[in-house]
Every structure is written in structure tokens, then in C-alpha cells.
Amino acid sequence: MNNENLSREEAAERSALISVDTYDVHVDLTNAKDPEFESYPTATTVRFSCNTPGAETFIDYIHHSIDSIKLNGVELKLDEVVDGARIRLANLKAENVLTIHGRSYYSRSGEGLHRYFDPSDGRVYLYTQYEPSDCRRVFPNFEQPDLKAVFNFRITAPKDWVVSSNAVLESQVTDPSDDSISKRVFAPTAKISTYITAILAGEYFTATTTYKPKSKVNSGDIPLVAYCRQSLKPHFDYDHIFKVTENGLDFFQDLFDYPYPYPKYEQAFVPEYNIGAMENPGLVTFTEDYIFVSGATEDDLEGRTNTICHEMAHMWFGDLVTMKWWDDLWLKESFADFMGTLGAKEANHFEDAWVTFANNRKAWAYMQDQLPTTHPIVADIPHLEAAAQNFDGITYAKGASVLKQLVAYVGFDTFIEAARVYFKRFEWGNTSLNDFLQVLNEVSGRDMQAWANAWLQTSGVSALGTKRVYGEDGQLTDLILTQELPAQQPAGLGRPHVAKLETFALTDGKLISTGVFSLEYPAEPVSEYRVELTDEQKKLVGEADLLMLNAEDHTYAKVALTDEDGLQAAIEGVSTLESALSRGLIWGSLWENVRDARLPVTTYVDAVVRNVSKEPSASLLGTMVNNSQVAIATFSAPTGRERLYDALYDAFSAALAQAKPGSDEQLILLRGLISVSTNATKGEELCRDIARGAFEDTTGDIADATGIPYDQNLGWSALGALASRNLVTVEELERASKYSPSSISSNGYAYAMAALPNAERKAAAYKTIMDDESLSNDALASTINGYVRGPVELREQYYGPYFEALLGVWESRSIGMASRIVRGLYPKAPYNIGSTEGLGVDDNPSVKLAQQWLEANPEAPSALRRLVLEAQDHGRRSILAQKFNASLQAK
């Protein structure tokens, strides 16, 4: 029986009935080196109390098999108590001891205990990833965040392996029957939730140092450890990672006025990781994509630093104080997202951190918040499947954006003081929104419920704007602030905004700031609001060539530049602005205009072409390079795209030629050139040159000119681009795959083979995706990403089979793997297929088939329906923009 989807009501009933004291967990990884073994033994003893003796509950365990279950000394009959992913526990006593012996699966999906065999040297690596509910794939437990406990881990594994967990290692004892095996015993953990327990095992490279605090608030020296695969050791810049970690610990301990609450700080960079990182206390895990084998730009380093600080903030927000249920996931993720950027800027001096936040994180939030499945920051999470889908742009980026608005609303010092009180009051416990609001009310001296109602418990994004009213003499008489509230906003409820307006003059092609002043939108739901201005402000606003609303990016709202605001001045002078954040806000506004079919893609691409060689910020340059390609692929008219891609290729190539050797710009632009070559008519020789350098130990003209070494990452990107255009043979791909076996090679090969634009390869890729459940998460993703390249006509025959297979995929795969397939294979028919003259967006095959499936499957799992609804909405937006751009093309 598939009963894995624990409901909120079931969790509440269980936490009202029991409290958990300790888990004693033994995991035996003796057989992990042998790929023939698909499972490993576990033994778990749980001590818990029940406030209603005689009652019953259940414990969670997604298992390979169960050997025995003993409750309070009584052996239970397996066929009577084991029911799918649950084990029924009846006739409970006031104090209970439960012991379960079983076997758990090694994972290939990144959920549970993931096992990886390194193709470059055969070494074995294991790590766990649980959030929100995959700890039960490793050992039996009460899988919900408010049943915290102390964990005692014992891990049996090869003696020469690295083995770690949340707590410090107490002892290591050699197996008397096999001196190549030993058992590691770890100290008891603090009282933590199941989803942040962790195990690491394998032949990892280990770097160590000791953190000696400079902060006033601290708990003394802390051992620091960093892990990675042995084959990545030459690229592992652990000194930088340690420096960021030390800076972060100094910063956050003083900021929160609370010492780091755990005895060690370890960070493992692991393969085939599904997410960016996970805040397991004492043993944080990261994707090994943060080990930069092809060199690192400032933007790359900033991104990793942000993630390190994000996870570190979780040691307080999330680990020390944890949400009661996943409804309040924002209580940790929104705060950590905000603190990650703050830590990158203030503790580690990445000056563009808030620029990246504005252009990347908030763009994610705006996109997510306009979907039909958007939800309040404080979400309604009825069950675990819903929880798994809510690690999204609302919970993370919108939540962090709203916290930034909160800081502007109550002041930074008040916000931080509230956090300090919150940690001390609720340490080692669980909380909800009301607990946080109570503290915020006390510290701020204000009733914050209205603010919470407006920002945390509503969904959708407001659209802000300005209108200038002039008198007959040509002088400004009024400045009107406009606000379009989301359609789903409750009647009578507005949104208070604290923002800034900056005025600019365009002089000799340069935008010069002439003034900036604060504005407050009223809390009432008004669509227009007249601003009281001084005479000087009236003059500045009236004469401005550009009005930048939400200057400094304090509030959360779409600000679409219009001709009245100075759209043309913004496009003409964006590169002349001194402030990277101001430039970023203009690029962000232009991007939203493209998505909303208000700005032609040709205009956006032309702006990128004219400014790409002038942008000094690595963060903004990367966004420009990436978004310009997405704009063409997703929103432009299907005819004429090659011309736009070629224009980008020429612009990137010219900018690369004048970029400083060894600069960030060089690497960003070279990556962009390879990517554009996937769709342009140009770039074949560049990609062949890179492939030769990567796989034949030669260098070519481009390598000689830039000094950038051609490694496997760049090589497989180049081969993937060539494969998409049918400019490389299967034999060439096979030869490259054997040059230097590695994860990069195997995934690059899977992508390139699936990208080849012929019916045979698309059929093989589709079958592999749907039928081969042995694929790892990364291999599946690479195959999907290659499959969707090339002419849409090669995939049309799979539109119907895709929808027919959805329920089966959801039932047979883990939620992570199923989600990859559902999102990745969703059909993306362009507007001119099925949407010719006289036909609407809903007549497009992709949209129509999705609608038919949704109507035919009203009882399908809500998480699956959400994925289909979101994909359908992305399709609708894409088709509307394509039609808009095609209509301009026809004029």
C-alpha cells in the first residue's frame, strides 16, 4: 500500500500523543562497495513516551525489507503491523522502547542514502538527503519536524573510509572478524528534527582547520572540515570555503547574539545532489557544482558564498528553532535566503550581492507568484507531497523579499532584535507564524498582524507605477502612485509599501541621478495615490528623463518601465549608471516587460547587444547573457530566431575579443558563446576548437587568444551544441566519452546523444527516460535536457504518450524523479502549431492536451496536478508573447 503521504492532521494527532526521547541508529555499510547489493542493514531503537497509555500510533519506514519489530519487549507479527511505509504501534505504554531491524535501499535519486560510483577512479561515495521526509528511507522514525529527539548514530563501514554524522566521533572500533571493517560511534546530537540528521561515508578527500572566533559572542574554537571526491581534489579551493565559513560564523554569532549551537562545522560537497545545499547541523551538504573545475567568476564565488551563509543562518533559523509543520517552512527558508545575501555582502564583501538578489532571486519570485498555483508565504500544506512542492520561489525568494520590505518598514535594528528574542525564547523548540509575530509585536511596539495579513497571508505580486500630471504651463502639478493589486487579493486589504523614487537626467547619452526620496504606499487598497512633494521634488520629478520607482529595491512589486517613466532613456543609458543595483533594476524591469509581452524581444536583445561589452558586474553580465537567450527561445516569434541568436553570437564574440585576459567577463562570454551556438547558424568552428582542446590535448585559436583552458566541462558543452545541430557523429561522441571517464563525461554524453536531431535518437531518449529506473538523478536530467533540444517536430509524436504516462510515472517513481520527468518532458509547442489565424492560445496542442488531462483527472495527486498546471501556464505565457512578437514582425 502506498501510504507515504503523511497528512498534517495525522502529524498533529501523533505529536499530541507522543514525544520522542532518543533514537539509537546503527547503519551497516559493509557491502556498499559492491554495486550488486541494492540494500543495507539497519537497526533502530526508539525511546518515546505516550500521554495516553493504551493508544496506538505508527512509525514511518520506506524499506527494502523488515526482519523484526519489538515493542516493549514483545515481538510483533510483521504481517499484522507493517502496512506499506507505516508500522502500526498499538497498546502503547507511558514509556516505550521500540526496536526495528530491517534493510534500506541505496538511493540513485538523491533521496535517502545516495550511493555514487565515481567513473573516473571507481571510488564509492555515500551521503544522505532527507528534506522534507526522506529520513524514513534510511531508518524508521516519526517523520515530522515537531517530534525532535536526540540521535545516537553508529556506522559500520570500511575502516579506510571517511565516515561522519551530525555529532562528533567518539570512537572507532575494528571489527574483530574483519580488520578491514570498523564501527564508528558518534556522540549524542542535540535535540533536532529527523529531516536534518545526516550520514556521510566513502573515500572522501578531507581538509581541516580550526575556527578561532573573532566575534564577541562565541562558544570557543570550532573544528572545520570540508569534504569532496578525490577526483575533484585538484579543483577544491577549500581555503576560500574556510575563510567564508569563518567570516560567517563571526558575523552571525554577533548579529544573533547567540553562540553557534553545535560542536563542529563540517561541509561536504557531494555528487548527484538534487539541490544547492542542506543545513544538517554539524554536517552541511552542498552540490559539488560549487567546486569550479572550469574556473570561477566573481559571480560563481558570490553564489557559493551566499549558499554557505544561507545554510549557516539555518543553524539558528530552522535547526535551533524549527517550524511545527511545513505550513511555516518560510520561518526558516525566507530568513535564510535573506541572511544568505546579507552575509555575502556584510561578512564577505561581495558588493553585488543585493544586485544578484534583485535580478535572480526576485525574478524567480515574480515568476512563481504569477502562476495559477501561487500561494501565500505562509502556505497551506495539507500533506508531505505538498510540502515537497513548496520549496519554491515563494517560500524562498518572495519570503526573503518581503523580509527586506519588513526591514524597511520597522528598521533593521528592530528586525534583528526580534530575531535575538525569538532564538532565546524558542531555542530547541518548534514555532509557528503567531510565535514570530508575537515577538515582532513586542520588539517593534507595533501591531504587526495587519502587515502579516497583507504580506504573509496573501498571494500574487502587485504592480506599481507612476503618473506625472502637468499643468498648462508645462510644470508638474502632481505625482500619482499607481498600484494594481493581485486579482486574488482579499477585498478591502491593501499592501503597505515603503519604497524610494530616484530621478535621472539623460545628458549626452549618460543617465545622471538628480535626486532620491522615500515614498510610502498606503495600507488601504487604493489604485491611485497622490504624493505630497516639495517644490524641489516637483521640479526633479517633472524634469526627469527617467523615474526609477523602488530604487534600492526595498519592496516586493513589479515595476514595469513605460514610455512615460522613461523607457527609452533607460535602454539608451543603462550602461552609464554608476550603481550596479540601479542597472540591475532596469534590466529586471525590461525582463518583466518581455515576459508580459509589453516589450519586443528584438528590443531586449538589441539592448543586450549594445551593452554586453560595457557591463562590469559579473552578476549582471551573466544575467544578460542567459536571459537574452531565454527571451529568444521562449518568447520570440518562432520565425527569425536564428537571426537573433546570430546577433548575440556576434556581440558576445566582439565583447570576448576586447575582454581583459583572465577576467570574469572572458569566462562568462565564452560560456555564452557555446550556449548560443546551440541555436545560431554560427559557432561551429568555435565549438570544434573547444572540443579538440578538451579531448585531443590541442589548443586552437580561441584558446590561444583567451588563455582559458579547455576542460571537459567546456568540451562537453561544445559537443552538446554541435550535437543539437547535427554537426557531430555518434562515433565522435563515443570517442570523447572514453577520453577521460568522469561524471562530467557520462552526463555530457547522455545529453549530447539525446540532443541529436533525428527520430531514432529522440525515440531512444524518450524510452530511456520513461523506462530506465536505474538512471541516477543527474543522468535522468541530462537525458531530458538533451531530448528537448532540436526541432519540435521530432517530439510531437510523444505529446499524447506523455500525458497518458503521467499517473504511472507519479506512482512508480520517487517524487523527485517523477517531478523531473513531468516538468522536463512537458510539450512546448510554439504558437504557430495549432494556433494559426482564428485559433486562440487554448487551441495550442500543448495547452489543449494539458487541459484535457486536468479535466479527465480531477482526483490525480494534487502535487502532480500542480506541476501540470504550472507547465501549462508557462506555455500560455510563452505563446502569448510569441504571438505578440509575431504580430510586430508582420508589420
Predicted features along the sequence, with ranges:
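General secondary-structure propensity
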Residues: 24-33, 322, 730-736
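Short, mixed-charge, low-aromatic patches
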Residues: 110, 196-203, 260-263, 292-299, ...
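Non-catalytic accessory/interaction domains
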Residues: 2, 129, 154-157, 163, ...
